[in-house]
């Protein structure tokens, strides 16, 4: 999360970047304004070896395990307003996955529909307008944050559906709850290598967004900014602030 925030700072200078990464160990992440205190059991997560973090972006809970996280940063006006940029980025993601044989599509957008509130429910339980699905089930969960002339959109591309863990870590849930999401493994066997997946996404971003993002090592300035931001994301006062 600290690195994503640091890359967002570079977006203020006009830089467009794409970062792809995984999590070790598995991690439960909360949306920026999601109520988590009293709703999720941090002790239970720790006993299972699961980290917990709060994202700088909005949205709902995601379990990061056997998935690939993407992070896109850019100037805030690069692709229009929040809704337009969100839709264009998600269309690029879907296009890249289709090149790998995944029947990915974007849920139709109803601009007059209500804005979803950050509830305790798992992000992957409900495909929302503008999100990437396959076979009617949610494949990618994304969220966007804008600040100081830059945007950060990141999200989880499921390789396998392990999102039931989100519900397993809820407080007071007496029965197991399935999360009807879908992972790439249900459509592609064997799974593409990280290099092949990265290549497909880079090419689709370059085509759909008309500007190929940088996908390279952090600059010294970005490393310094990430180091400063790291303390916030390791602090329980941020993670469990609400």
Regions found by a protein language model. Give the residues of each.
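N-terminal low-complexity, intrinsically disordered segments
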Residues: 1-56, 207, 211
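Gly/Ser/Thr-rich beta-alpha loop segments that engage phosphate groups in nucleotides
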Residues: 33, 60-61, 143
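Aromatic/basic-lined ligand-recognition segments
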Residues: 125-143
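Long, positively charged amphipathic alpha-helical accessory segments at protein N-termini or as interdomain linkers
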Residues: 93-118, 146-242
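A glycine-rich, hydrophobic loop/mini-helix early in the fold
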Residues: 39-80
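Internal, conserved structured core segments that host functional sites
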Residues: 67-129
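Short loop segments at secondary-structure junctions
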Residues: 34, 75-77, 137, 161-164
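Histidine/cysteine-enriched polar flanking segments
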Residues: 4, 8, 28, 45, ...
